[in-house]
Amino acid sequence: MESLPARLAQASPASVDGTWQRHVPAKFIAGALNGRSATGRWGTENGFPVLYLGRPTESVTVEAYRHLIDPVADAAPPISPRALITCTVSVSTILDLRSATNRILSNLTMQQLQSDTRDRDAYRACQNVAAVAHQLEFHGVIAPAATQMGETLVLFTDRLPASEEPARIAEKLWTELPPDPRNPGQGRRLRVVRQ
């Protein structure tokens, strides 16, 4: 079997346009569209900077619940205020993992792409693909969202030319999370603790 770099070099780069969103702690609103080197599905603490975006809004909301609520036992854990950032994107040279062909080339399964936030093996597999894509000078990765609704766009901000940087078009303060789209009518929300 060919190496991962050799296989991913066969993937056809895609272009991605449209409106995307992300949630951030409100205190980081100014730098919300900057990439960060941090451990996540597509990045590592000591790696290259990544910027996570999602669509539709329901997917971004579920992602907030997956990371802030689902792993916590308290029915209403306290959080700081958050912000929903909306931006427009027009990027090229994206590894498109929505394509079954590219998922086969990357050796990633839908189960790995949509794994629980605590599945370290799935995260390592995705991080490895992102590292190779970055090495091959892709500008990012687009994949089915882990929320199982919508898409995730991960931009490698150190690879983006200035003309492809996301443009902020709106921001909305969340003093509590919107209702969880996975549980319509359930009303389970976060309460905000003022510091």
Listing of model-derived features with the role each one plays in the protein:
Residues 1-35, 41-44, 71-195:
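Active-site and NAD+-binding cores of ADP-ribose-processing enzymes
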Residues 41-71:
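Extended catalytic/binding region for NAD+/ADP-ribose chemistry, centered on the ART fold
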